[in-house]
């Protein structure tokens, strides 16, 4: 089983870390360099963590736990207007990035008004491309409990609700974080930062639960292994979009148009098999992107059996 960690240190002798990660069968997921400082997110076999810890100490860096690394999470507000788009939405998205997640903020097209708020099938499908969704609702318990619960009742990915009133639980969501309503300023006081931590821990618990479900029928190949091959494609190397390949719990998002890269993706060699045999590849609802969903071991066996019998 792979463990995702982040190295935080300097660029001096950083190639030694890259070589060591490769030698133990791990992967470099992401690099972020700022002058002579660098952070590197790596996926390594859990049993080899002491080796990486020793090298990190030798290089004068530190290893940071990033429990949400390898996930992409949507932070959803009822609308993008200032009525529903206060600072907490952005603060939550930013705080989750410190835990290693890639986050995106989105608003619903017709979320304004307690009785008129709605979510379309396209919006639900868009949200379900992510590993989890955080719905940041308002200050009125009656509005949330009677009307706004409709917004996420049919969403299949884990949902965490963040709201102002004290609500013990809501249907169809993993957790409710109370005490964070609409605010006109940044969340920078101690009690507000504690709420950001509470939100991050709720997301971490939901992701951990989903990882355990996936481990019951493991993926036929780890997303980090696929990413390593996808990064070698010329169209991906030429992409100017930030993080052109984003890891998910069960696949990847490649920020290259589907029509441009579908054939190249399907032909990638993964341990002697084509990527198209091990995954489903489809256009993403996020414009100009492609979604790769990795088959589980059981799904791959079923597909292979069906192909051999036909």
Role assignments for model-derived ranges:
Residues 5, 27-33, 54-75:
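Conserved short beta-strand edge segments in small beta-sheet-based binding/regulatory domains
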Residues 24-55:
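Helix-enriched interaction subdomains in cytosolic or periplasmic regions
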Residues 16-24, 55, 59, 95, ...:
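Generic non-transmembrane alpha-helical segments
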Residues 8-29, 52:
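Short amphipathic alpha-helix segments
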Residues 92-95, 99-261:
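Long, charge-rich C-terminal accessory regions
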Residues 61-100:
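A short, flexible N-terminal coil/short beta segment enriched in small residues
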Residues 1-9, 38, 74-77:
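Short glycine-/aliphatic-rich beta-strand segments at the starts of folded cytosolic domains
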Residues 246-310:
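C-terminal, charge/polar-rich interaction regions
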